[in-house]
Amino acid sequence: MLALRQGALLLSARGGQTTHDNLQLCAGPSRRPRARWISSAPRPSTLVERHIRPQASTASDATTSTSQRILSIHDVDNGQILGFGADLAEDHPGFHDPAYKQRRAWLAEMAKTHRIGTPIPDVEYSPAEVATWDAVLEELSGLLPQHACREYLRCLTLFDFRKGRVPQLEEMNTVLRSTTGWTVRPVAGLMHPRHFLAGLAFKHFHSTQYMRHPSKPSYTPEPDVVHELIGHVPLLADPAYARLIQTIGLASLAADDKQIWHLTKVYWHTVEFGVVREGDQVKAFGAGILSSYGELAHMASGAAALERLDPFRPQPRMAYKDGFQKRYFVLDSFAEGSELLSSYAASLGLPESLRGDASVA
C-alpha cells in the first residue's frame, strides 16, 4: 500500500458490532499458518506529502546516492512505514477504540515479520469484519459490471470473492503467480513511496491486511484490505495492466526524491484513479474507483473532467480530502500507458535493459 491516504470510500453498507481480542499465530488445518484473535485486555498519522515533498534546493541535494538505489526486491523494505498499526489520526473512526487499535498493531507486527518467499499467514477475520466485506461486495455488485473496464471484469472471475469470508493474501498469490508472476506481500501500513514503487518494479505489490472500522463500513481514511483486494488485486492478473504498473516501478529505480514525488502523483492518477477508453465510453481501472461505490457512481455520472495522461507534465495535486475526484486521467489502452511511462523512465536515465517488459524480479 502506497503511503497515500484515500478519501472517503462512500459505500452504503451494513454496520455491525464486534468484540475484539488479541491475535495469535497458530497452525491451522491447511498448510498455511493462520492468525487467530484470542482474548487479552486492552499521534495521528502524517500524510505522505508532508514527509516526502522534496526540500532540496540544489541539484546535488535532489539526487539519490548510489547507496540509496534499490537494486533487487531484497532491498525493498516493507518496514519503511510512515504510519501504521495503532497510530491513527484523531478523526479516524477507530481512534477511540483501544481493541481496534490493538488489533491493527498486531496485524502490523505480523506484516513486518514476513519474509520474502515464505507463505503469508492467514488472518482469521471477525464476524463484524466479514460483514463489512459483505456489505461492500453487495453495494459494488450493481455498478462494477457496468462501469469497470473489461480487463478487470475478466480477471475478477479468477478470484474467489464472495460473501461470508474475507479472502487471504496467499490465495491471491496462487492466482497471480500462475498468470502474470506477480506477488502480493503484506505491509504494516502506509509505506514510503520509494520502497512501495520499487516493489512494483520487481512485481511485488504491498498490501495491508487490516479492515476498516466496523462503525463506518462506508468509509476508510486509508487503504484497507477491502480496497487492496477489490481495487488492486484483480488487474494484477492482466498482463497489459501488470506491465503498466511495473513500468511505474521501473521508473522509480532511476528517480531522485523530487522525481519520486512526481511518480507518486502519476501513480495516483492512474493506478488509483485512472480510466480507460472502451469505444465511446470510459471505464474505471483505478483501485480508488473500483473499490468505492460512491466514486464509481461519480465517475459514471460524467460530472468530472477527463484529461489525457502526460507523465512529462507537472501533475496536479492528489485530492484525497475534497470528496470525489474533480478530474480523471484517460488512457486509450494499458499498452499506450506503458509506452508513455517507459519513455518517461528513459528520460530519467533508466537503462534500456530495464524498460518495457524487462523482468528484474
UniProtKB/Swiss-Prot annotation:
Task: Show the InterPro entries listed in the entry.
Answer: ArAA_hydroxylase, ArAA_hydroxylase_Fe/CU_BS, ArAA_hydroxylase_sf, Aro-AA_hydroxylase_C_sf, Aromatic-AA_hydroxylase_C
Residue spans of biased composition, Low complexity class: 56-67
What's the Enzyme Commission number for this chain?
1.14.16.1
Q: List where in the cell it is found.
A: Plastid, Chloroplast
Cite the binding residues for Fe cation: 227, 232, 272
* UniProt-recorded Gene Ontology molecular function terms: iron ion binding; phenylalanine 4-monooxygenase activity
- SUPFAM superfamilies in the record, alphabetically? Aromatic aminoacid monoxygenases, catalytic and oligomerization domains
Q: Where are the transmembrane segments?
A: none
Instruction: Give the reactions, separated by semicolons, that this protein catalyses.
Output: (6R)-L-erythro-5,6,7,8-tetrahydrobiopterin + L-phenylalanine + O2 = (4aS,6R)-4a-hydroxy-L-erythro-5,6,7,8-tetrahydrobiopterin + L-tyrosine
Q: Name one GO cellular component term.
A: chloroplast
Region Disordered: which residues? 47-67
UniProt entry keywords in alphabetical sequence: Allosteric enzyme, Chloroplast, Iron, Metal-binding, Monooxygenase, Oxidoreductase, Phenylalanine catabolism, Plastid, Transit peptide
- Biological processes annotated in GO: L-phenylalanine catabolic process
Transit peptide residues? 1-55
Q: What class of enzyme is it?
A: oxidoreductase
Per the record, the major location class is plastid
Q: Does the keyword Transit peptide apply?
A: yes
Q: Name one Pfam family in it.
A: Biopterin_H
Q: Does the keyword Membrane apply?
A: no
| Cofactor(s), names only, from the UniProt record | Fe(2+)
The record's similarity note reads:
Belongs to the biopterin-dependent aromatic amino acid hydroxylase family.
Known function: Catalyzes the hydroxylation of L-phenylalanine to L-tyrosine. Can functionally complement an Escherichia coli tyrosine auxotroph.
Q: What is this protein called?
A: Phenylalanine 4-monooxygenase, chloroplastic
